[in-house]
Amino acid sequence: MNPIICALDTQDLNEAISLANTLRDKVGMIKLGLEFFAAHGPSGVREVAKCNVPTFLDLKLHDIPNTVAKTVEAIKVLNIEILTLHISGGTKMLEEALSIVKDTKTKLIGVTVLTSMSNEDLSELGIAREVKSQVILFAKLAKKVGLHGIVCSALEAQEVYQECGKDFKIITSGIRVGFGHDDQKRTATPKEAINSGADYIVIGRPITKSNSPANSAELILKSLS
């Protein structure tokens, strides 16, 4: 299994298609986010899917249960591999979303605490727990409800693995290669993430903005062995 999920963070459909074609044999999955979906909608997802690479649609859904269920109903026809939603939406929202995809190949993955957030950010929201404790709480709820796994940072992955077991998938974002700075606060290298128990690592710009995306993906994969 190739654990690399390449984030195609672009509004440019042609660029997304070109990257998907270039990387389809180099990564395990490609990720399309809210930026792409807002620009191109379901038709854009279908176009990228024609490149024959598994697709992860990262919409981080969070609304009342009925609205999320209807949204998942509309999305499930896209035949994607993974769809994300916020665990903080609560048990009923998660259960209703799961009921929609039960006969499809789409796996629902829960978002715990965004990797752009710190303990101080949680405190500002009135959440007394530290990030790691909040992630573990969300992970246990996600497993109890029946989600296929979660998204967290590598800093929490080992404890999630210990609490939830090997069949509960862990996708780590906030992965950094070399020296780069952005709005991520809880970061790790690809090797650190895999060693901590992650099943998949999400990597964007270190691959997509390199001179050779295919070569960069190959080098990252080799670094994991």
Curated annotation (Swiss-Prot):
Entry annotated with the keyword Metal-binding: no
Protein name, entry field: Orotidine 5'-phosphate decarboxylase
Assembly information from the UniProt record: Homodimer.
Source organism of the structure: Wolbachia sp. subsp. Brugia malayi (strain TRS)
Signal peptide positions on this chain: none
Family: Belongs to the OMP decarboxylase family. Type 1 subfamily.
GO MF term list: orotidine-5'-phosphate decarboxylase activity
Function as written in the Swiss-Prot or TrEMBL entry: Catalyzes the decarboxylation of orotidine 5'-monophosphate (OMP) to uridine 5'-monophosphate (UMP).
Record's keyword annotation contains Lyase: yes
SMART domains named in the record: OMPdecase
Pathway(s): Pyrimidine metabolism; UMP biosynthesis via de novo pathway; UMP from orotate: step 2/2
EC number(s) per entry: 4.1.1.23
GO annotations of cellular component type: cytosol
Enzyme class: lyase
InterPro entries: Aldolase_TIM, OMPdecase, OMPdecase_AS, OMPdecase_bac, OMPdeCOase_dom, RibuloseP-bd_barrel
Residues annotated as binding substrate: 9, 31, 58-67, 115, 176, 184, 204-205
Active site: K60
One Pfam family, short name: OMPdecase
The organism's place on the tree of life at top rank: Bacteria
Keywords: Decarboxylase, Lyase, Pyrimidine biosynthesis
SUPFAM superfamilies on file: Ribulose-phoshate binding barrel
Catalytic activities: orotidine 5'-phosphate + H(+) = UMP + CO2
Gene Ontology biological process terms from the UniProt entry: 'de novo' pyrimidine nucleobase biosynthetic process; 'de novo' UMP biosynthetic process
CDD domains: OMP_decarboxylase_like (cd04725)
